[in-house]
A protein has these predicted regions:
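A glycine- and charged-residue-rich anion-binding loop/surface
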Residues: 1-198
Length: 198
């Protein structure tokens, strides 16, 4: 995986780190930097970017470029060549819980109703999940909710791992990855793997 080293893959709970600026640029008129490494998660797959500070500047957006670099958009120019990053811990943990919850609920709809997840949007106050069903009764919705809650109450360990592109065919995915390259997999039990292109 090229570009910025993604520290959140090594430790999803890491919220403080030091990094070198490798590029200074602008994004929509705001100062931005690319770092050699980051704990800031970029906007991806319906999950918002991490909030926080870099060298005292507020992080306004975190975006992944096509070259794999992570762009950190700031409220003011970064000073110096080395920065201390601080990710907003409560917001990060909220995003992690909501994202995992979405995977669990999506799987419940798939198992019970063969309802494919079409889109997911995570907001500050509400998250939405669009399921591809022509019709669903209230009873269907309650069954999916009960199934998802049962999985949550089982307190399953969530594991992440990477699968090289040439071995993706060995992974039981519901649909093919949208991107080429390394696939990040998330599993809450041996027979269910949720793929996430990274």
């Amino acid at each position: 995986m090229g570009g910025t080293k993604r520290l959140y893959y090594e430790d999803a709970y890491l919220t403080e780190f030091d990094a070198e600026i490798v590029e200074r640029t602008e994004h929509e008129g705001k100062p931005a930097v690319v770092l050699d490494r980051t704990a800031f998660y970029p906007e991806s797959g319906g999950q918002p970017w991490d909030k926080g500070e870099l060298g005292g500047a507020s992080v306004l957006a975190v975006l992944e470029r096509e070259d794999g670099a992570i762009l950190h958009v700031l409220d003011r120019p970064a000073e110096g060549a080395r920065l201390r990053g601080r990710v907003d811990r409560p917001a990060r943990f909220d995003h992690m819980q909501q994202h995992t919850g979405q995977h669990v609920l999506s799987q419940a709809f798939w198992e019970l109703l063969k309802g494919e997840t079409l889109s997911f949007h995570m907001g500050a106050d509400i998250s939405t999940l669009e399921i591809g069903l022509k019709a669903a009764s209230d009873a269907d919705l309650y069954r999916a909710e009960d199934r998802a809650n049962a999985v949550v109450w089982e307190d399953r360990e969530v594991k992440t791992y990477f699968v090289p592109e040439d071995r993706i065919g060995e992974v039981p995915l519901r649909r093919p990855p949208k991107k080429q390259g390394l696939l990040r997999g998330i599993a809450a039990r041996p027979d269910f793997i949720q793929g996430d292109e990274q």
